[in-house]
Amino acid sequence: MQTPNLPAIRALRPAWNKGRIVGKKRPLKPKHVWAIRVRLELAENHRDLALFNLAIDSKLRGCDLVKMEVVDVMASGQIKERASVLQSKTRKPVRFEISEGTRSSLARWMREPLMIGSEYLWPGRFHERLHISTRQYARIVREWVTSIGLEASAYGTHSMRCTKVTQIYKKTGNLRAVQLLLGHTKMDCTVRYLGVELEDALAIAEAIEI
């Protein structure tokens, strides 16, 4: 007698996202940016302060930020006012500004012993790792947001990328500028990224009283 082929019985596993907030990560508000900067300055954490400032200015994806090299931001011994990085996702360059405060924190970080002879801007702590990983970067961001009392699950590396462009859009309404700054190839990507349609609809609704 042949035994029928029955489906294998597997133990049920809880969903990977059970109990987690996995939606779009929130941008930091200006007061959050200020609070984190002050804490890093008081702690004299030069690496993290430079990383935090450049993450906001560059608006780069985490995978591109961690791989940045010293030559990307420095020329002839001076920190550049503008820089360009080739995006790993689109293989297209994106330009960004480096503000005065960010240049100052980068220059201070460059003077650290760990940076002597380093090719990468954020060198790894161990010889086999040339630069910090995206996982390490995510952990660092989590430490930043929790240090000022924010919920870690609501923020992430994406928060760093969208913090400045969110303020730019709120103040100017210029979607094209945001598209260029983020390095998006299509405008609809930028619209979805910022949640523009929903935000605009809510703003209109809030202005109407019945």
Model-derived features: positions:
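Conserved catalytic core of the tyrosine transesterase superfamily
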Residues: 1-210
